[in-house]
């Protein structure tokens, strides 16, 4: 019997999301206008909390839908105006271009990245050195490329290798159901479990590597570009401004990688089983033997385009998004991708997040119009200039660990910029706060998948169920990194940021810019 129209409407509303989640969103949408009519400031904070809730529940429903409904309602009831939202979007156009074009551009360099990570995995036999290499490679790539793309490539390598061994273990060469272990013998099942542990640890090291590298440069994370634009920094200066915090954090992060592997802590330390290595090596040898000259030339072309990307970013030859567009044009031209649909696939990864970021800017417009963060900023600015840095770092870190760090970084840098424009803080102090905001937004956010988009991408990927990587296990495996990165970052903000920055200014490495 066919269901009623009411039941059909309920099922269509937010699709497969749990009923309690749908009900919660409906309550939000009913309550917000009522509260706004009585107490606009309270309603504004209610909206922010609700929006953070949708980000935290990203596994129940992609936040674009519920967050978008909340943003539309905020516009309809007058919490902000379409004109203000347009201003926010226009002011952050570079970030949208970064997400649209740079991520799509790197998509056409995936063959090269797959080649690099495959060579690492099979070329390094020591698990400690392999983990360090994956972490370092992910960090380096994330400093210039989008972290999501780097993680996507590592996922592709892991799924490919898992599938190769799973088919051998199941004695079914054509089996595509990688989740089904029922027909695998006990011995192979034990080896497969070890292989899962090995892949879990590598994926987590690579994920943390993207955070370590992503915090260092203005293109490493979307919020970095927003912060760099607010402070008037280019690529080189951004790196030097962050270096007093990010370089010690990088060293301590890599030491953590070695320690958890050596002492097999927090689920790390599982080596690659010899039988699996043998199977993978044989497969790779066959693949390399079959590689044509055309495929080799594609890899060389992608490597040269990678060099162009790094040089163009380092010397700020154009806006980041336009450099990404040049990568799309060069990569498609020299790898022979000419079909419109094949090119279109490159944009599917980034556009949902680009749309979500546009919704972020709507919420930011509400925060500005309703002056929601004014009491928080006034409280922080009452402290001494030195204490302000630690407070900004901690406030950012706390919110970024449960919410999306792009949203948090955007809100706080806007508030700091407003304080500068109103004369509440000096220009040198604003620059220090920008460093504290950027590092506070990026480093503690490794605590949960909600904070790091790359972690959330990994958790929702096809690989996660294959290697038994759940939300809880991811938080547990990230814990040593969370503690080390957060504490070392805080200590550096507290003790090394100001003296090292003063030294760089005194020796002409940095200059105080004229703000845009």
Curated annotation (Swiss-Prot):
The keyword Cytoplasm does not apply. GO terms for cellular component: plasma membrane. The chain crosses the membrane at residues 23-43, 61-80, 97-117, 120-140, 144-164, 202-222, 238-258, 303-323, 348-368, 391-411, 447-467, 475-495. It is a multi-pass membrane protein. It catalyses: 2 Na(+)(in) + 3 H(+)(out) = 2 Na(+)(out) + 3 H(+)(in). The keyword Ion transport applies. Pfam families: NhaB. InterPro entries: Na+/H+_antiporter_NhaB. It is found in: Cell inner membrane. GO terms for molecular function: sodium:proton antiporter activity. Keywords: Antiport, Cell inner membrane, Cell membrane, Ion transport, Membrane, Sodium, Sodium transport, Transmembrane, Transmembrane helix, Transport. Its main location: membrane. Na(+)/H(+) antiporter that extrudes sodium in exchange for external protons. Belongs to the NhaB Na(+)/H(+) (TC 2.A.34) antiporter family. PANTHER family: NA(+)_H(+) ANTIPORTER NHAB, TRANSPORTER ARSB-RELATED. HAMAP family: NhaB (MF_01599). This is Na(+)/H(+) antiporter NhaB. It comes from Klebsiella pneumoniae subsp. pneumoniae (strain ATCC 700721 / MGH 78578). The lineage of its organism: Bacteria, Pseudomonadati, Pseudomonadota, Gammaproteobacteria, Enterobacterales.
């Amino acid at each position: 019997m066919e269901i009623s129209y009411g039941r059909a409407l309920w099922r269509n509303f937010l699709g497969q999301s749990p009923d309690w989640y749908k009900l919660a969103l409906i309550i939000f949408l009913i309550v917000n206008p009522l509260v706004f009519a009585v107490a606009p400031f309270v309603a504004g904070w209610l909206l922010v909390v609700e929006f953070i809730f949708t980000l935290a529940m990203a596994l129940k429903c992609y936040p674009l839908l519920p967050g978008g409904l909340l943003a539309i309602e905020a516009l309809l009831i007058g919490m902000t105006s379409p004109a203000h939202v347009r201003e926010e979007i226009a002011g952050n156009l570079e970030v949208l271009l970064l997400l649209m074009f740079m991520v799509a551009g790197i998509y056409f360099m995936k063959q090269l990245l797959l080649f690099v990570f495959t060579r690492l995995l099979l070329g390094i036999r020591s698990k400690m050195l392999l983990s360090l290499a994956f972490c370092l490679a992910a960090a380096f790539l994330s400093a210039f490329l989008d972290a999501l793309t780097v993680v996507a490539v590592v996922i592709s390598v892991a799924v490919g290798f898992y599938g190769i061994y799973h088919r051998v273990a199941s004695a079914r060469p054509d089996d595509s159901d990688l989740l089904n272990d029922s027909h695998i013998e006990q011995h192979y099942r034990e080896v497969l479990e070890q292989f899962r542990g090995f892949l879990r640890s590598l994926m987590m090291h690579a994920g943390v590597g993207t955070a370590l590298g992503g915090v260092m440069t203005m293109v490493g994370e979307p919020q970095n570009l927003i912060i760099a634009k607010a402070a008037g920094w280019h690529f080189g200066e951004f790196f030097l401004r962050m270096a007093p915090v990010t370089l010690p954090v990088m060293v301590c992060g890599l030491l953590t990688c070695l320690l958890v592997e050596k002492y097999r802590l927090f689920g790390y330390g599982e080596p690659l089983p010899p039988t699996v290595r043998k199977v993978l090596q044989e497969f790779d040898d066959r693949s390399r033997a079959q590689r044509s000259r055309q495929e080799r030339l594609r890899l060389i072309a992608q490597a040269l385009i990678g060099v162009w990307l790094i040089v163009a970013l380092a010397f700020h030859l154009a806006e980041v998004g336009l450099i990404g567009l040049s990568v799309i044009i060069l990569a498609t031209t020299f790898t022979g991708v000419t079909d419109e649909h094949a090119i279109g696939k490159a944009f599917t990864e980034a556009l949902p997040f680009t749309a979500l970021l546009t919704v972020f800017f709507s919420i930011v417009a509400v925060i500005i119009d309703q002056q929601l963060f004014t009491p928080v900023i006034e409280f922080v600015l009452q402290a001494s200039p030195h204490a302000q840095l630690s407070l900004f770092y901690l406030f950012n870190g706390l919110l970024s660990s449960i919410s999306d760090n792009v949203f948090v970084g955007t809100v706080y840098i806007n508030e700091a910029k407003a304080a500068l424009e109103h004369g509440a803080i000096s220009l040198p102090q604003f620059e220090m706060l920008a460093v504290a905001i950027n590092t506070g937004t990026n480093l503690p956010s490794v605590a949960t998948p909600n904070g790091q988009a790359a972690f959330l991408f990994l958790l929702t990927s096809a690989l996660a169920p294959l290697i038994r990587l759940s939300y809880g296990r991811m938080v547990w495996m990230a814990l040593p990194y969370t503690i080390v990165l957060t504490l070392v970052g805080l200590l550096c903000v507290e003790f090394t940021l100001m003296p090292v920055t003063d030294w760089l200014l005194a020796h002409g490495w940095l200059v105080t810019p004229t703000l845009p």
